[in-house]
């Protein structure tokens, strides 16, 4: 029996040391050396204070701000510990009701309804935490935001363009706008205005 237990204990201790101590330590040092911003959560700072992460969406509901994708984490929106989609299928009547309610909320906020609503403004993402919207979703909100801030639509559209990231390496993903970064740029532009 002793001959069976000793190798098991040795393997347990060695694997615990490798996977529980050595590997995490090496990856932490590597991450801090090569990707310090990402390793620390891709935090966005304003006046030396962290105001959010570039990787996790935040709720914005005031008309003077661009709104991001809806969060599927309830009851607390954009709760990273509750990440997950709504799991409503495309034929589910509840999804259609939710989309209609979201379109009505956009209309009530004074958004121009003469053009089709971009899908990312009325549906949640798979994670429920998306920090980004499509350029079309940002363009759809330009008039409302400009009116609420007493800025020209052209000035707001220029901020959208300046905060639009292209495809990674020119081929991966789609162009996107980080809502938090755009809203911070809007605040800065209005303060300077």
From Swiss-Prot:
Main role? Answer: Part of the high-affinity ATP-driven potassium transport (or Kdp) system, which catalyzes the hydrolysis of ATP coupled with the electrogenic transport of potassium into the cytoplasm. This subunit acts as a catalytic chaperone that increases the ATP-binding affinity of the ATP-hydrolyzing subunit KdpB by the formation of a transient KdpB/KdpC/ATP ternary complex.
Q: InterPro entries, alphabetically?
A: KdpC
Alphabetized Pfam families for the sequence:
KdpC
Cellular component GO terms, alphabetical: plasma membrane
Assembly and interaction partners: The system is composed of three essential subunits: KdpA, KdpB and KdpC.
Name it: Potassium-transporting ATPase KdpC subunit
Q: Where are the transmembrane segments?
A: 7-27
Report a single Gene Ontology molecular function: ATP binding
Subcellular location, record wording: Cell inner membrane
Q: How does it sit in the membrane?
A: Single-pass membrane protein
- The primary location reported for this protein is membrane
Into which family does the record put it? Belongs to the KdpC family.
Q: What keywords appear on the UniProt entry?
A: ATP-binding, Cell inner membrane, Cell membrane, Ion transport, Membrane, Nucleotide-binding, Potassium, Potassium transport, Transmembrane, Transmembrane helix, Transport
């Amino acid at each position: 029996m002793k001959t069976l237990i000793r190798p098991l204990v040795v393997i347990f201790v060695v694997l615990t040391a490798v996977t529980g101590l050595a590997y995490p330590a090496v990856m932490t040092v590597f991450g801090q050396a090569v990707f310090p911003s990402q390793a620390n959560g891709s935090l966005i700072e304003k006046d030396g204070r962290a105001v959010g992460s570039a990787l996790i969406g935040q709720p914005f509901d005031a008309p003077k701000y661009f709104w991001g994708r809806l969060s599927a984490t309830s009851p607390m929106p954009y709760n990273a510990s509750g990440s997950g989609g709504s799991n409503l299928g495309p034929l589910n009547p509840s999804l259609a009701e939710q989309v209609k309610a979201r379109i009505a909320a956009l209309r009530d906020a004074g958004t121009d309804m003469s053009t089709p609503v971009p899908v990312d403004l009325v549906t949640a993402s798979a994670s429920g935490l998306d920090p980004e919207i499509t350029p079309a979703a940002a363009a759809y909100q330009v008039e409302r935001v400009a009116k609420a801030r007493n800025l020209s639509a052209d000035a707001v559209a220029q901020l959208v363009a300046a905060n639009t990231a292209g495809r990674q390496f020119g081929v991966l993903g789609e162009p996107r706008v980080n809502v938090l970064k755009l809203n911070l740029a809007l605040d800065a532009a209005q303060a300077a205005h």
